[in-house]
Amino acid sequence: MSSTKQKLSFASDYMEGAHPEILRRLLETNMEQTAGYGLDAYSESARKKIRAACQADDAEIFFLIGGTQANAVVIDALLRSYQGVIAAETGHISVHEAGAIEFGGHKVLTLAHQTGKITAAQIESALAAYREDANREHMVMPGMVYLSQPTEYGALYSLAELEAISAVCRAADIPLYLDGARLAYALACPANDVTLADIARLADVFYIGGTKCGALFGEAVVFPKRNTVPHFFSIVKQHGALLAKSRIAGLQFDTLFTNHLYEKGGETAIFAADRIRSALREKDYPLAYDAPTNQIFLVLDDAQKARLSKQVEMGFWENLADGKTVMRIATSWATQDEDVDRLIALL
């Protein structure tokens, strides 16, 4: 994001291309001839680094293009035809994937949320309601649980919350899936107490987001235990999601997991977001949600919205009953200090 632009952009965290180090390595290796379909040395190097970061020596790792694709493939691979996936009513698979999960033949079973989070007690209650219903054989069976870290509202699951949810899932013998589209920003947040190793221990599958965290594209799907889904490679292919030139994704993750680049990108975003949050509070802008990560949800009246929108691109979130609007500001790995300075001056 260049400070010379007339209009600042804080609309989302995937507006830029990729971290310059990724582009440098892609250019350096451009004319190399490597094996396809993730069988190249760069993809294998990335897998080794991710296994080390997750403290999961037996993990199977696959590189897919984007988050919706990863969610659709993983969920379809883990569920039987008569099963659905439990998720928050605000979850990405519930509202922002154009029915991709339903298109694959599986119902999203939604639960009420608090800043995008659901609880172990809610999940346990939903599972019990199914078990105790005399007509359950005529109903969609809850077959897995979907969470995201951070949530759509920028909130974080604590380690205790994830441990409780994982325990419920394991007692019910259903998989827990964690969407990590913005995982770099969760890991870098001072309020976070969940590590990659914790996620690998508690979830049956998760993905490490690249698209929103410094890569041109790509998500790394991680199964901590080998053979969780037999022949997952073939399932990816069947969904049209297998990259022939998968080395391009593998190389990006190899770069992100070299010299802590993934963590540094998250830290850049959180530092910028914390500065903006502090300025908003100092200038008495109400915040709609207590979100400690890279997404900030501010409440604007019509005059404030019109004034700021002339110079700052923000994301619309929701209209409130009092006529005000919740707008989202998102920082990223690429946010520049001077752009934060300019935004604060405009408030």
Functional labels for PLM-detected ranges:
Residues 19-67, 89-94, 100:
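Conserved N-terminal alpha-helix of the aminotransferase class I/II PLP-enzyme fold
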Residues 77-95, 124:
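Conserved PLP-anchoring active-site segment centered on the Schiff-base-forming lysine
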Residues 114-115, 141-142, 148, 156, ...:
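Active-site C-terminal subdomain of aminotransferase-like
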Residues 105-143, 147-150, 157-164:
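PLP-dependent aminotransferase-class I/II
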Residues 81-82, 274-347:
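Conserved C-terminal alpha-helix-loop-beta "cap" of PLP-dependent enzymes
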Residues 157-189:
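Catalytic PLP-binding core of fold-type I/II PLP enzymes
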Residues 108-109, 176-178, 287, 314:
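Hydrophobic beta-strand scaffold residues
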